Amino acid sequence: MASSDVFVAAARKCLRVGKKRFSATVSLNLATQVLAVDLGLKPALLYDSNTASAEQVQQYLNSLQAAQLVSKSLQTLVISENSLIVNPSLTIANLEALLLRRTVTVVDVCHSLEQPAITELQWGAIRDMIQALLAHIRQFGQHSAMRNVPHRIEKRHCETWNLCTLFGILLGYPSTYWFDQSRSFENCLAMSPLVVTKAVASWQGGDSGVEGHRCCLYSFSTPEMLQADTQSVMASWTTQLQERFQQQKVLSGLSVTRSTVTLPSVAL
């Protein structure tokens, strides 16, 4: 059985919800994302293909690991009922770098603001959140017997975390949004031009019909008005991604594109 067929079969068997089964396209997109995490091209992926439980996501990951398609180091991390497949070593390295050098730009998009703005005021709370998450991930890594089950961070530990900010960091974005969720979950991005960055690659699997399969590895936005302020961190992120891409041979044809959109509302 070709590796692409194993990925598709694993998704259809483990991640099914109700009677609707995964299409080959959705299965291959997920497979490419998981491979990107395993290859160190991205630190984590947020599972959103359907409403499969964390246990189902872990079963899917276990199946791929048993077939030796991905390394056994990958883990399922559950934060506030959101399932992520993470590369622990890369995630830890990214979080440590963030604490040392503030490698991610934080953009305040509170609804009360007239326009988005880069903020330094929230670094104290963000630092505390990252330090707590690092402690959890390191603790999980010390229990090898627990690698085949989802690692859940209890609600009492993360109920005050700003998940919008955190997920942007965990997914490896060079900039992330912040808003005061104690006041409102709305933001000031409506009708504000946004530059959407996408990184797309092909799965070079060698299987018939798979080598040309294109998948979006990254997709995130930054306010157009802040392009001058975020140019340095964006350039560094792009260079780092290109360098990591050149160090592997599983995926090919990396393309990083940017386009500007203006939307009547933006959900974060």
Swiss-Prot record:
Q: Which domain of life is it from?
A: Eukaryota
Q: List the disulfide bonds.
A: none
UniProt-listed InterPro entries: DUF4504
Which spans of this chain does the record mark as coiled coil?
none
The family annotation for this protein states: Belongs to the UPF0739 family.
Designated name of the protein: UPF0739 protein C1orf74 homolog
